[in-house]
């Protein structure tokens, strides 16, 4: 049996995953990286994208992440993500409604701060929608 990788996925709210897996593919800032046990130590920022967790005999887990860092050490892989949501939890119709509301919030913004905040929310929702 192949050696397993210790993998922890942490968001500001909670520990989302902690366990041993066969491989994790992360959306690094310089491109996707497949991480397995014994990988050379590396640190990378994350771009918005999908983390794929592979484990023999189990369905592949796919998790959207927006920003954060990944660190590979001899002990394993730790991902500190700014925002995460399992792809299975996303609903295209609901996201389309939220995008329409966010568009309205941008148009209705009364000052630059509110407009910037609304634009960030809109961009975030569009990134999520692109993954569904």
UniProtKB/Swiss-Prot annotation:
Membrane topology: Peripheral membrane protein
UniProt xrefs under Pfam families: ATP-synt_DE_N
Assembly: F-type ATPases have 2 components, CF(1) - the catalytic core - and CF(0) - the membrane proton channel. CF(1) has five subunits: alpha(3), beta(3), gamma(1), delta(1), epsilon(1). CF(0) has three main subunits: a, b and c.
Family annotation (HAMAP family): ATP_synth_epsil_bac (MF_00530)
GO cellular component terms given for this protein: plasma membrane; proton-transporting ATP synthase complex
One MF annotation (Gene Ontology) recorded for this entry: proton-transporting ATP synthase activity, rotational mechanism
Primary role: Produces ATP from ADP in the presence of a proton gradient across the membrane.
Subcellular location: Cell inner membrane
Signal peptide range in chain numbering: none
Descriptive protein name: ATP synthase epsilon chain
Keywords: ATP synthesis, Cell inner membrane, Cell membrane, CF(1), Hydrogen ion transport, Ion transport, Membrane, Transport
Species this protein is from: Parvibaculum lavamentivorans (strain DS-1 / DSM 13023 / NCIMB 13966)
Alphabetized InterPro entries for the sequence: ATP_synth_F1_dsu/esu (IPR001469), ATP_synth_F1_dsu/esu_N (IPR020546), ATPsynth_dsu/esu_N (IPR036771)
SUPFAM superfamilies documented for this protein: Epsilon subunit of F1F0-ATP synthase N-terminal domain
UniProt record similarity statement: Belongs to the ATPase epsilon chain family.
Cited PANTHER family: ATP SYNTHASE DELTA/EPSILON CHAIN, ATP SYNTHASE EPSILON CHAIN, CHLOROPLASTIC
């Amino acid at each position: 049996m192949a050696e397993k990788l210790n993998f922890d996925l942490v968001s500001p709210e909670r520990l989302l995953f902690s366990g041993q897996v066969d491989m994790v593919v992360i959306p690094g800032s310089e491109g996707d990286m497949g991480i397995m046990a014994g990988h050379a130590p590396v640190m990378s920022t994350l771009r918005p994208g999908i983390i794929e967790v592979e484990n023999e005999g189990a369905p592949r887990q796919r998790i959207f992440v927006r920003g954060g860092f990944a660190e590979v050490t001899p002990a394993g892989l730790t991902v500190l993500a700014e925002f995460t949501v399992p792809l299975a939890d996303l609903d295209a119709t609901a996201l389309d409604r939220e995008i329409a509301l966010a568009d309205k919030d941008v148009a209705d913004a009364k000052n630059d701060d509110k407009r910037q905040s609304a634009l960030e929310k809109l961009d975030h929702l569009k990134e999520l929608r692109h993954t569904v």
